[in-house]
Amino acid sequence: MSPIQPDLVDVWIFRTRADRPPTAGEPIEILLLRRAKDDAILPGLWQGVSGGLDDGENAGAAALRELAEETGFGPHQIECFYHLDQVNQFLEPGLAGVVTAAVFAVRVAPGAEPVLSGEHDAMRWVSPEEALEVAVWPDYRESIRRILENLLDPERAAWFELKLNGERVRP
């Protein structure tokens, strides 16, 4: 098997309001980050974490590195790391081809707060409903829906969970 290496990773961050794993129907908050207004790429866009892979880096490692770089969240704040079984593809104007992004999600501890990098100039924790309204790209909305459908039920979430080294957690 020759896996295709994605160009980018997207990481969606959520937290519960209680100090326990989420359950279906329980309120969660999703972190939205606004790209800096002076950024060359999509200034002012509300998004999750997004970034490229370094040479020789796998997608899971890139997701955790980008998460730390853009929010300061590391192993002590991460409660669970998930793949969303989603690879987005889009045509970026000015590039000669299609760009792919592997999509991940991270549940951080209740009360955890990001420390923003210069890439973003604002952040806000919002309800999933507000995140769906604010998300510009259809793939962003699909990622949010996958969090709601797959990661709030502990039995189902176990199938998507990864160790921090990128290996699957076996349910």
Predicted segment positions?
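Conserved Nudix-box catalytic region and its N-terminal flanking loop in Nudix hydrolases
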Residues: 25-69
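A generic fold-level signal
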Residues: 3-6, 25-27, 40-41, 96-99, ...
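Conserved N-terminal beta-strand and adjoining loop/helix that marks the start
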Residues: 1-31
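NUDIX/MutT-family hydrolases
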Residues: 103-105, 114-147
